[in-house]
Amino acid sequence: MTLRWYGSKFDTVTLKQIRQIPGVKGVITTLYDTQPGEVWTREAIRALKEEVEAAGLHIAGIESVNVHDAIKTGAPDRDYYIDNYIQCLENLGEEGIKLVCYNFMPVFDWTRTELARELEDGSTALAYTQDAVDALDPEKMFESIAGDMNGTV
């Protein structure tokens, strides 16, 4: 079993805490201090791997190598960013990471209308309601997202 880990700079849950959960052997993570379109170096990938492995876990996959908007929109400079994306995937593979979750969502990357909807068993989950999004003014939507991040990136 794996858990999502937002990195030592951004996650309030440490790898040591994750390691204490019975059955958890790895994490799904990413390089949060890189910009879309930037090539991930093997050194940066290796440093992330070493940090996770030092805690007794492994990187089960990456979510995600963010796709530059030039690729999503077919802009004239898209080929440059496609080449960078390919290099990122090659570097990940060379460092032994074989799973990448792809994210091609435009503009807001991902959007949820609730970050902690309570479920019947008392646990919480992310939720998305299209009617709530349709009723939002785009500027108010951005303000809501920016102001309600609850510690997430």
Model-based region annotation:
Residues 1-16, 55, 63-65, 81:
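Short N-terminal secondary-structure initiator segments
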Residues 1-5, 25-29, 59-63, 100-102:
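Hydrophobic faces of well-ordered beta-strands that scaffold small-molecule active sites
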Residues 3-13, 31-44, 79, 107-110:
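Acidic-and-aromatic substrate-binding clefts and catalytic sites of carbohydrate-active enzymes
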Residues 11-30, 131, 136, 140:
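Short, charge-rich amphipathic segments
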Residues 15-23, 40-60, 90-94:
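Acidic (Asp/Glu)-rich catalytic clusters
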Residues 21-42, 63-74:
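N-terminal substrate-binding region of glycoside hydrolase catalytic domains
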Residues 24-28, 48-51, 81-83, 122-124:
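Short, surface-exposed linear patches
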Residues 71-153:
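Active-site acidic/histidine proton-transfer and metal-coordination neighborhood
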